[in-house]
Amino acid sequence: MNNLEFRVPKDEKEFNEYDLFRWRLLRKPIGKTIESLKDEYEDNSFHLIGVIDNQIVACGRLHFIDDSKAQIRYMAVDEEYQRRGLGTSMLAALESHAKDNNAEKIILNARDHAIKFYTAAKYKILEKYHGSDTGIPHTTMTKDI
C-alpha cells in the first residue's frame, strides 16, 4: 500500500464522498440516514481520510471537548482494507493532531467489536456508554497522550 495517503478532504466533492463513506460503513447498516452523521461538533472538527488510488478507504474525526481533551469519532476502515494497519495509522494521525493542538487526553466511545483494537493502542476502558443514538453497545475509553 505504497500509495496510501492520509489527508483532510480537499474540497466539497471530497467532503461529500467522505460523508457517504462514513454513512455507508457506520450508519447505513443500522438504518440511520446520512443526515444522522452531523452533530454539534461537525463544523469544528478535524476530519481525516485515508485514500488509495483516489478512493477513500478509511476515515476518522477528532474534535476538542475542552482545551486539553479531544474526542475521536467516526473511525472506520473499508472491510477490504482491514487488518493491514490502516486503522492503527489513522488512529496515530488523529492522536498526533490532538497532541499538536495541546490535548493531553483523548476519549472515544468504541463499539464492542473494536475494544480489542483500542486496547492494543493503549486505550483504557472507563465505562459502558449509553448515550449513543445507534442502539449499538459502546464503551467509553481514554488515553493520555
Task: Spell out what each predicted region is.
Residues 2-97, 101-121, 126-145:
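Anionic, Ser/Thr-rich low-complexity intrinsically disordered regions
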